[in-house]
Amino acid sequence: MQTVRMTTAQALVKFLNQQYVEFDGKQQKFVKGIFTIFGHGNVVGLGQALEEDAGELEVYQGRNEQGMANAAMAFAKQKHRKQIMACTSSVGPGSANMITSAATASANNIPVLLLPGDVFATRQPDPVLQQIEQTHDLSISTNDAFRAVSKYWDRINRPEQLMTAMIQAMRVLTNPADTGAVTICLPQDVQGEAWDFPSYFFQKRVHRIERRLPTKASLADAVEMIKRKKKPVMICGGGVRYAEAAEELKQFAETFHIPFGETQAGKSAIESSHPYNLGGIGVTGNVAANTIAKEADLVIGIGTRFTDFTTASKQLFQNEEVEFLNINISEFHANKLDALKVIADAKEALLALIDELQEIDYQSSYTVEIADAKDAWETELSRLHNIRFTCQDFTPEVEGHFNENLNEYVDALGTQLTQTAVIGQINTLLDKDAIIVGAAGSLPGDLQRMWASRKPNTYHMEYGYSCMGYEVAGALGAKLAEPSKEVYAMVGDGSYQMLHSELVTSLQENKKINVLLFDNSGFGCINNLQMGNGMGSFGTEFRYRNQETRKLDGAIMKIDFAASAAGYGVKTYHVTSLEQLQEALIGAKKQTVSTLIDIKVLPKTMTNGYESWWHVGVAEVSKNQSVQAAYESKVSNLQQARSY
């Protein structure tokens, strides 16, 4: 048997260079590159291996471990899970910073390979710098926290363990039904230890992502269910995009006259203008999709996890005869809502159903309902685009909260811009193939409802975990995946302040991204949530501490985000009017470096809910009558929802 004497880290790098995926007959490298932040826990081990021979891996320098791991996830998401980035960090806090990203990737079923440095396997220098000591179990390190949020976790305590660990890692990373974060912990001493690895460990490995076919029995059951139903509705989930099944979904909708709503992950699989595309569905959905969904007698979920936002906490579907048909590659997700399960690739399942349903000449019984619902939403959308603030008699979209306070915000922020009008103008002015990236705050709701996707795969929303601070790093990841397209991070001031470190990496790599920063000086959507459930405004506005009350109810904070970003070398713009916004968007397109447009918008001018409810933990007992009323409303709504 031929062997190669290498360190554990060198063997890992060589192995990663030999991984390929094949999908629909097309083969490509699986691991595009690796994000690094070096510390004592990885620099002389994995860092040495990368310096000596990185092979074809592109090595990137991150600025924050969570930021670079978010970028890696966004890269894989934009690549439809067919190519990934790895991430290496040092031991302790560097590793811990990636835990949030691991959770984000696993929640979204997006493959990311995390390689956190770890404490010494020998324990000789214990406690090493940045080591946690647990007196009840000395084998525990910070990296054990990854177990809860990883789809596969392993620790390499001996060099020869690398082989089985990485074979299993690739199994999970290339499995569409169970992919997510894979964490391989690398003790810093083991990274540098040598072993005689067999040559066959480094052979070219092609991981074929196969399309699972539906069984004849499940297909027959699905046909029987559909033919009994008159008003079905489909839900286009992220699985439609990852399975590249958009054309088949279009064909299914057009052939059988069945409309579909979009989840955040599924949006832009098909253009918004398609006659059967109702748009966003659920808590952050629009009036068209939610109105049709309420009356549907069959819900066909395609590649969706049926989160509470999609089902409106399982209260959206009000037809007493409604049933569920779930098409999903994952048996776990297909099993939800007591559904009839078709465990299969979305494309193959749709093609099989098309053949079977054409045999019986199936048609839904919709007449004008689909067109009427879309027309009603277009009318509402036009209204939202044209909302303008007036100092007197202005009623914000989220009314009853700040009606008397808005003039204070006008003065403090120097703006009269409404969020819906800003989104409308951005949607009009961006290139049709531009990619928008979002994750947290009020913007995901506005974008799922309002954004018109004019080209496929241009809407990139991380809403499986709604990770605050994902947006800027996510934009970098999307840009690395599609460097020829303009990429825009749609981010609020709250999320931007949590994390935007990879803006600097975008400059370093000459990968231009555009940050559209909506500043309403607060955590606006959570302010809406608390006040909408009977509370006052508490801890969600960005106000100075009042020296008299000792509370955060002083003057409104105004931050010059443009000036801050300019210090990095970003081209920046200040915007307080639609005219300035148009000039900034046109100017940003001409730039070759990353840009940031600091857009001051008024709170409470985002969209509100349409025909939906969200179950949150309202206080059962309170001295506040409005909280009591909110609890009673919760109980009433819960009675109309499924129990599971």
From Swiss-Prot:
Q: Which cofactor does it need?
A: Mg(2+); thiamine diphosphate
Paste the cofactor note.
Binds 1 Mg(2+) ion per subunit.
- Coiled-coil spans in chain: none
> What InterPro entries does its record include?
DHS-like_NAD/FAD-binding_dom, Myo_inos_IolD, THcHDO_hydrolase_firmi, THDP-binding, Thiamin_PyroP_enz_cen_dom, Thiamin_PyroP_enz_TPP-bd_dom, TPP-bd_CS, TPP_enz
Q: Where is thiamine diphosphate bound in this sequence?
A: E65
| Annotated region described as Thiamine pyrophosphate binding, given as residue ranges | 442-522
Q: In which pathway does it act?
A: Polyol metabolism; myo-inositol degradation into acetyl-CoA; acetyl-CoA from myo-inositol: step 3/7
Q: What is its EC number?
A: 3.7.1.22
- Segments passing through the bilayer: none
Protein name in UniProt: 3D-(3,5/4)-trihydroxycyclohexane-1,2-dione hydrolase
- Origin organism is Bacillus thuringiensis subsp. konkukian (strain 97-27)
